[in-house]
């Protein structure tokens, strides 16, 4: 899917309660990593429940270009034949990641630590996003940046060393992508590569490295033990394995909030990953008074998963602490929508990282709230939403800036607002939730062109 094609406006209108069951798409973080670690393993990796959105398919194509055998066996079922650490080949063409920030940054870590040369590129949105924070530690590990666009952006070309240099690196920002890129580069380093982070970020890379056979230790670090010290022993033999991808909590967030704010709704969301570093939104919504019940907890793909029963609820404003941001960085747009229907003030603190997402997501959320009559202020890196317990006015058109989460968040608003809400383009929703429209329509949601 090209992000340069003509826009596809969508409108959501209020209607009947949402009812039914759904399973959101597979988790994007685990889907990317299953392809990447499958590439770096010896033997075969089989993946069930892969998210077949554009972002992950770009990562799969890059793994194939670097030498892996990649085959789709059926819906969500894939086989990856790995080449092992050090076995990558130079790709014949540019690695085009489209809109995939995660896939591109993680694969920079892979290429940056191996004796291979590759050029990375993407769409207009990806070309605007900073890569310097990834390139800085990689150059310390021996990666050469042969060419780059201004400001360390794609298109850029990397050449990795015969062996990476093991380093100890303190991340300058709470970013699982920086941590993961360094650890992936460290797979081809003789010795221990250590990443120190001031606040714990999502730990899928560490969990999945262990699943594939790497030795990774994680210890609390810093004041109050809020940070983490992650150490990887380099040059392991990774073994292909079977991966069952749980449902993505960041995608589950949209039907979840919709069920909370559309009166009379009662929805069950199946198989959602409950990793403690990914459920900041659920924690926050429970504090706001949401009726969310966890049932049938079980293990899948090295992660705890559960079914969530969600019923329409009266919500109250809360303060969301900055240290929760890493556990819900992708969920703030839809939390802002929930806050628009709550009684009282909701303050979301420390949202600096939202400014370097697919769009300046903080500015995009604020503009969307303004277009739909929601009282709010942006104070530095804080977003404050003033709700009066009634339905948001709605009636506006939201500029998505090619950002799938902005599009879905404001379509959710439209299902419960007093007036329909339009987003200027819904095409990019396919990057993370290809079945969003039919899924919401099956629950009774009125969304269409």
Swiss-Prot record:
It is found in: Cytoplasm. Pfam families: EPSP_synthase. Pathway: Metabolic intermediate biosynthesis; chorismate biosynthesis; chorismate from D-erythrose 4-phosphate and phosphoenolpyruvate: step 6/7. Its EC number is 2.5.1.19. CDD domains: EPSP_synthase (cd01556). GO terms for cellular component: cytoplasm. The active site is at 330 (proton acceptor). SUPFAM superfamilies: EPT/RTPC-like. PROSITE patterns: EPSP_SYNTHASE_1, EPSP_SYNTHASE_2. One of its GO terms (biological process) is amino acid biosynthetic process. The keyword Zinc does not apply. GO terms for molecular function: 3-phosphoshikimate 1-carboxyvinyltransferase activity. It catalyses: 3-phosphoshikimate + phosphoenolpyruvate = 5-O-(1-carboxyvinyl)-3-phosphoshikimate + phosphate. Phosphoenolpyruvate binds at residues 28, 101, 129, 177, 361, 405. 3-phosphoshikimate binds at residues 28-29, 33, 175, 177, 330, 357. InterPro entries: Enolpyruvate_Tfrase_dom, Enolpyruvate_Tfrase_sf, EPSP_synthase, EPSP_synthase_CS, RNA3'P_cycl/enolpyr_Trfase_a/b. Residues 1-30 are annotated as: Disordered. Keywords: Amino-acid biosynthesis, Aromatic amino acid biosynthesis, Cytoplasm, Transferase. HAMAP family: EPSP_synth. Monomer. Catalyzes the transfer of the enolpyruvyl moiety of phosphoenolpyruvate (PEP) to the 5-hydroxyl of shikimate-3-phosphate (S3P) to produce enolpyruvyl shikimate-3-phosphate and inorganic phosphate. PANTHER family: AROM/DEHYDROQUINATE SYNTHASE, PENTAFUNCTIONAL AROM POLYPEPTIDE. Belongs to the EPSP synthase family. This is 3-phosphoshikimate 1-carboxyvinyltransferase. It comes from Methylobacterium radiotolerans (strain ATCC 27329 / DSM 1819 / JCM 2831 / NBRC 15690 / NCIMB 10815 / 0-1).
